[in-house]
Amino acid sequence: MVFKTFLSCVGEAFYLFVLGWLLAQLEIQVEGAYGWAEKLPTWRFSPPWFLKITNGKPLTGYHFYLISFLFFVFHFPLCFVPFSKAVEAKIIASYWLMGDTWDFQWFVWNPAWGIKRFLNEKIAWFPIKLIGFPIEYYLGLSFSFLTLWALDPKMLSRWVIVAACLLTLNALAAFASLIKPGKELGENGSPR
């Protein structure tokens, strides 16, 4: 029973990793070297009070609609099962875990960035780092954990396994990107 639960957690982590990786690949194609939709023709909501809440990031039309789409995709299971706090907690916690993976994989596989640049350079849209990683990653993990803690605490042990597996998969992907890196691109998108 314990091994079956562990395998289920590994499968869940793998699914969230693949979903995050695919979203990262899509965003690399859309944004190129310019994260946070910097060069995209999209609206931006950025009053000073909002920028204080978001660590200096405007809300872009691109991100608003993409995240709204993902919100509905993640809630699709509610078409088949009755709403419950436990199901909603799982949906929200899973979204936050996948979101950290999605963003990190954008840096890992983006030819204009890569893991070395991610760890060593300042990222304009992530001005605060803690132990080499944007503070938002820790917030995502915290929101994921706290959602389960508040709505379905019996799932916390499962969450720990899924989160640990996701961290491992992200580390393996970062290592793999160093073994077979893509061609690095400069700021203007041309090879360095």
Residue ranges and their predicted role:
Residues 1-192:
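Aromatic-rich, lipid-facing transmembrane alpha helices and their immediate juxtamembrane interface loops
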